[in-house]
From Swiss-Prot:
It is found in: Membrane. The chain crosses the membrane at residues 7-24. Its cofactor is heme. It comes from Arabidopsis thaliana (Mouse-ear cress). This is Cytochrome P450 84A4. Cytochrome P450 involved in the production of catechol-substituted substrates needed for the arabidopyrones biosynthesis. Converts p-coumaraldehyde into caffealdehyde.
Length: 512
């Protein structure tokens, strides 16, 4: 009787599992994509110094649009063609919806408690909805007002330094930092003096480097993860400690403010206020078993500080870099600004932005050549297949937006700065549906702050180019401006841009 019962249970189970096992076997028989041959056990670890967006783009030109690398027992796949990118970001985006976990990511995001690096699932969907609603939606009008006001302050700062060399990197970081702080934390940053700005810059840039570096310790067995031949683990601990104190002070300030203003129902709230309120409600509803904790709040604050500050700042610096290398494009966009806005007014309004066609082309061309995140990080949630190649579960997949934006099969003269290419009615847009141009990603893991970031980018550049003519210091020529990049998850300029503003308006700049 026991044998019969066993058969009754096992036969349906085997009939159910057999097709899945057969499919798994068929997948395993498929080859991996081409790539450089690795050594036994360690794979391609000795090539790790080539694994930035530029080095991977070169390897993809040799091995194709889907490249396979092996680091220890881990598989890495690099996507550098629009067709493969479409498969990853659109057709099978549910399969590639997780984020890879590294020692740096795990430690700097409080164990994956943030939004940007947590895995896809119910928690991620819930947090993204809150994130967008609390900070990035047009209904959250305070976020958009803060952009206008902080841009106007930066214009006044530049106006007070006319004729003097300005560090554009610091100017852009100060602006984007204050926009982010106003939108998320309710007030401009407390790091307004020069020394604190330098300190804040160093922290953000170190985070970017750590998020983007390949760490040998990530690709050895867990019992050997204490090995730190590159010194990255020590840097990770120091970086988190430097930022952790600031984030905790932000939370403490909001908790104290709430106590002081407990009875003031009309008091304006910011993102942190709303996160803390949501956290308290979760505790009540779930009887102290909450789905959102203080680490989640700290992780999201880290996301906003890093993503909201650095990406906009770097984009502003890169667009001015390219404009200074291309005087004819500077003249053309300033002629457009003169025609649309007029030299008798210094404010560029939203109604003007809609008509600044060539300015938008310049911004898109800058994002094509210098995408905010040159490598989009994904991880597979299950085994899958792309173009006849096997991609196993748990693999790291990197979409090389830098390579996509310079693909000669998609772009004519791809290395040249040519904003006019976007005047073509069928030119790619920023909606994430043209996979040769996805600077903010596409699909469910695309950048949630894209709209606010683009608005800040566009408004800042419009004002800087409308109010001032920019020239190079010390007799430099346009050809002397370099485009060498520094290391990091983003693409900072290795040597900060320095430029000299002169007024081009017929009216005074008055900022209330």
């Amino acid at each position: 009787m026991l044998t019969l019962m066993t058969l009754i249970v096992l036969v349906p189970l085997l009939l159910f599992l057999f097709p899945h096992l057969l499919l798994r076997r068929q997948m395993l028989l498929k080859p991996y994509p081409p790539g450089p041959k690795g050594l036994p056990v360690i794979g391609n670890i000795l090539m790790m110094n080539q694994f930035n967006h530029r080095g991977l783009a070169k390897l993809s030109r040799i091995y194709g649009g889907l490249l396979h690398l092996r680091l220890g027992f881990s598989h890495i796949f690099v996507v550098s063609s629009p067709d493969i990118a479409r498969q990853v970001l659109q057709v099978q985006d549910h399969v590639f919806s997780n984020r890879p976990t590294t020692i740096a990511i795990r430690y700097l995001t409080y164990g994956g408690s943030d939004l940007a690096f947590c895995n896809y699932g119910p928690f991620w969907r819930r947090m993204r909805k809150l994130y967008v609603m609390m900070l990035f939606s047009r209904k959250r009008a305070e976020s958009w007002v803060s952009v206008d006001e902080e841009v106007h302050k930066s214009v006044r700062l530049v106006a007070s330094n006319v004729g003097k060399p300005l560090n554009i990197c610091k100017l852009a970081f100060s602006l984007s930092r204050d926009i982010t702080f106003r939108a998320a934390f309710g007030s401009s940053s407390s790091t307004s003096d020069e020394s604190r700005l330098d300190e804040f810059l160093e922290i953000i840039q170190e985070f970017s480097k750590l998020f983007g570096e390949f760490n040998v310790a990530d690709y050895v067995p867990s019992w050997l993860s204490w090995i730190d031949p590159q010194g990255i683990n020590g840097r990770v601990e120091k970086a988190r400690k430097s930022l952790d104190g600031f984030i905790e002070s932000v939370i403490d300030d909001h908790l104290h403010k709430k106590k002081r203003e407990h009875d003031n129902v009309d008091e304006e709230t910011d993102m942190v206020d709303q996160l803390l309120a949501f956290y308290e409600e979760e505790v009540k509803v779930n009887n102290s078993v909450t789905k959102i904790n203080l680490d989640n709040i700290k992780g999201i604050i880290m996301d906003v500080m890093f993503g909201g500050t650095e990406t906009v700042a770097l984009a502003i610096e890169w667009v001015l870099t390219e404009i200074l290398r291309s005087p004819e494009n500077m003249k053309r966009v300033q002629d457009e600004l003169t025609s649309v806005v007029g030299l008798d007014r210094w404010r560029v309004e939203d109604t003007h932005l809609e008509k600044l066609t060539f300015l938008k082309c310049i911004l898109k061309e800058t994002l094509r050549l210098h995408p905010p995140f040159p490598l989009l990080l994904h991880e597979t949630v299950k085994d899958t297949e792309i173009s006849g190649y096997f991609i196993p579960k748990g693999s790291r997949v990197m979409v090389n937006t830098y390579a996509l934006g310079r693909d000669p099969n998609s772009w004519s003269d791809p290395e040249s700065f040519n904003p006019g290419r976007f005047l073509n009615p069928i030119a790619p847009d920023l909606k994430g549906n043209n996979f040769e141009f996805v600077p903010f990603g596409s699909g469910r893991r695309s950048c949630p702050g894209m709209q606010l970031g683009l608005y800040a980018f566009e408004l800042a550049v419009a004002h800087l180019l409308h109010c001032f003519t920019w020239s190079l210091p010390d007799g430099m020529n346009p050809g002397d401006v370099d485009t060498v990049e520094g290391p990091g998850l983003t693409v900072p300029k290795a040597i900060p841009l320095v430029a000299v503003p002169t007024t081009r308006l017929l009216c005074p700049i008055v900022v209330s």
